């Protein structure tokens, strides 16, 4: 932000689309989980998720043969070995939980930097942070500016597999085990909302129902376990990842554009759902020197050519 605070109410974005409409196309999108071998698209970072998927499908011999091809690869060979041990059913193999994960994890801690801010402070915004080993240095780049907080606005990991909790845990744990991430998370508060790739699959939506499809609540619980937001939507009765918080007199409002989103093919589809919309209208009325409104997708139609995912 890096500027003196003045008594002005600032909205960084304006809701420019109808968010409440009739319950047309009121179901979740079809999942498009891509299990193709990652080398077909040069996606070497997907080697381990593909190997894990084979293991979870019971194709352990195929997984071992596949992973052995990359055993000496420079891309996290220790993780390759971990998955081979998992496929071999070794007694000390990872058991799909935090306790048996082989490496130390560093989770976000939003209780950091709670002292009163000065009239100038810096906020970092990010997202679209799929795991690419050579690019993990980005956390060092962010840490170098020593922001008051980092706000991650979705696609913070690329899971694309909402029905498979083991896959979700692997992606979170892998990121939390990286030294660059650990260094940043130990000194900067990190807040997060999700988008399609860490909630569902590409350009997907959850639909208006709280517990349909059944995977929605499970994805939400894993998200909660791996971030440290002040609260998560309306809690158990109304799951979601929307929340707000303050730094001094600056009000940060972050919304959830996936859990209750309806099909963009319907007439006047909702992006937020009625409960979140009610919360948002009330929250935006709170007086602040600045109100910073954060969303996982553009809120203006037609800004993504060829896509209605706004």
Model-derived segments and spans:
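Bacterial N-terminal signal peptides that target proteins for export
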Residues: 1-10
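Bacterial N-terminal signal peptides
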Residues: 9-19
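Acidic, histidine-bearing metal-coordination/catalytic regions of metal-dependent phosphoesterases
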Residues: 24, 28-39, 43-46, 50-68, ...
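A conserved position within tetratricopeptide repeats
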Residues: 71-72
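Metal-dependent phosphoester/phosphodiester hydrolase catalytic core
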Residues: 91-310
């Amino acid at each position: 932000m890096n500027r003196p605070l003045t008594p002005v109410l600032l909205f960084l974005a304006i809701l420019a689309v109808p968010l409440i409409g009739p319950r047309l196309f009121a179901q979740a999108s079809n999942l498009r989980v891509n299990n193709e071998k990652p080398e077909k698209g040069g996606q070497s970072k997907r080697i381990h998720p593909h190997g894990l998927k084979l293991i979870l499908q019971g194709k352990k011999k195929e997984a071992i043969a596949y992973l052995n091809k990359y055993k000496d690869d420079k891309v996290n060979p220790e993780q390759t070995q971990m998955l081979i041990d998992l496929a071999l059913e070794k007694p000390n193999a990872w058991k799909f939980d935090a306790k048996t994960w082989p490496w130390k994890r560093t989770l976000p801690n939003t209780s950091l930097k709670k002292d009163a801010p000065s009239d100038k402070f810096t906020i970092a915004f990010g997202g679209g942070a799929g795991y690419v080993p050579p690019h993990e240095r980005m956390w060092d780049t962010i840490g170098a500016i020593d922001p008051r907080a980092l706000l991650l606005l979705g696609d913070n990991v690329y899971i694309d597999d909402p029905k498979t909790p083991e896959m979700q845990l692997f992606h979170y744990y892998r990121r939390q085990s990286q030294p660059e991430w650990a260094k940043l998370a130990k000194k900067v508060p990190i807040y997060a909302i999700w988008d399609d790739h860490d909630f569902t699959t590409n350009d997907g939506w959850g639909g208006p129902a709280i517990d349909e499809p059944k995977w929605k609540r499970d994805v939400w619980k894993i998200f909660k376990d791996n971030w440290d937001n002040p609260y998560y939507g309306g809690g158990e009765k109304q799951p979601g990842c929307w929340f707000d918080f303050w730094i001094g007199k600056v009000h940060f409002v972050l919304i959830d554009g996936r859990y209750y989103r309806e099909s963009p093919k319907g007439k006047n589809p909702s992006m937020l759902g009625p409960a979140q919309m009610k919360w948002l209208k009330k929250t935006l009325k709170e007086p602040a020197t600045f109100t910073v409104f954060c969303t996982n997708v553009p809120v203006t139609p037609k800004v993504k050519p060829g896509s209605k995912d706004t």
